[in-house]
């Protein structure tokens, strides 16, 4: 008995990880933030797993050591974290506590009042968030860290706002590559990020190219997914 099985392309990492979680309840091949590791690192103070090494507690304010102040929230340190929402715990209609992960660590982020009302639609499982706020040691969690949010945006909005360059590293492109690239970029034109091609070659020469201003793009995750899937694109990265 011979069975001929069709040859199909390998699943993208995100699709593979989703299947692993749905089937097994956990990830085997990596973490969902892995495709965005470079972007998350550029948009945050440091990876979550490095906070303990990088954090320097602020100097206490005058009289903060007094017994009458032991329940007062101490000073915090300005910090930016980035990661994927893995759990949301709401308290009433005005507060939420969100767990972010990035494959290297975990942190709880608190959202209160008006900010919570503004960004509540983003506080959903699997959402990639960039959060600015005040970092402090959480004495109630055994010495972990907590961030009190002051502003937040999705990874897509952060990339759209801050990305200045989309770099494509090429390897072995075919004759249809230019048309395929134009098609992939077409729906994202009109943004602020330049596009560069590293290792572009034809029968006559090899060069690094920067596309003209007419091809500046909104360098959001959906675009990165599209260009990474093109034959001949070895890597696609944003510079922020």
What are these regions, as identified by a protein language model?
Residues 1-240:
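Noncatalytic, beta-rich nucleic-acid-contacting surfaces in large DNA/RNA-processing enzymes
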């Amino acid at each position: 008995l011979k069975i001929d099985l069709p040859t199909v392309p390998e699943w993208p990492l995100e699709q593979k990880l989703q299947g692993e979680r749905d089937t097994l309840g956990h990830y085997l091949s990596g973490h969902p933030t892995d495709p965005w590791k470079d972007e998350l690192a550029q948009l945050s103070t440091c990876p979550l797993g490095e906070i303990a090494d990088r954090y320097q507690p602020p100097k206490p304010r005058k009289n903060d050591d007094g017994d009458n102040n032991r329940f007062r929230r101490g000073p915090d340190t300005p910090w930016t974290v980035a990661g994927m929402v893995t759990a949301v715990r709401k308290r009433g209609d005005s507060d939420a506590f969100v767990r972010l992960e990035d494959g290297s660590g975990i942190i709880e982020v608190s959202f209160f009042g008006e900010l919570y009302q503004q960004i509540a639609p983003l506080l959903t499982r699997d959402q990639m968030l960039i959060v600015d706020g005040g970092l402090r040691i959480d004495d109630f969690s055994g010495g972990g860290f907590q961030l009190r949010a002051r502003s937040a945006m999705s990874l897509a909005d952060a990339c759209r706002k801050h990305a200045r360059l989309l770099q494509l590293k090429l390897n072995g492109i075919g004759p249809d590559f230019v048309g395929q690239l134009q098609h992939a970029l077409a729906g994202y034109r009109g943004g602020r990020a330049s596009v560069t091609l590293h290792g572009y070659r034809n029968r006559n020469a090899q060069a690094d190219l920067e596309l003209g201003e007419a091809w500046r793009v909104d360098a959001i995750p959906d675009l990165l997914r599209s260009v990474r899937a093109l034959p001949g694109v070895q890597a696609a990265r944003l510079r922020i």
